[in-house]
């Protein structure tokens, strides 16, 4: 059972202002959700293989293929600003 104080504490941690009435309401609702999840403890999972991923696909990567790229002049022709053969981007900090 989640208490009103625990809800208020979590609200404080998340910097969310929760009123007393709301905290009481959330405590009841969250407790019912946790009770619902508690039903999973009663399910017989004997002999059931654990599921680590929904799909059995593991690290599907494509082969790296070396292809010709654009010429530096063509790339720099498409940029607003360039300096010393490089694309000049705006300062962020």
Curated annotation (Swiss-Prot):
Pfam family, one: GatC
UniProt enzyme class: ligase
Recorded superkingdom: Archaea
Matches recorded under HAMAP family: GatC (MF_00122)
Family: Belongs to the GatC family.
Name of the featured protein: Aspartyl/glutamyl-tRNA(Asn/Gln) amidotransferase subunit C
Source organism of the structure: Methanococcoides burtonii (strain DSM 6242 / NBRC 107633 / OCM 468 / ACE-M)
Gene name linked to the record: gatC
Keywords: ATP-binding, Ligase, Nucleotide-binding, Protein biosynthesis
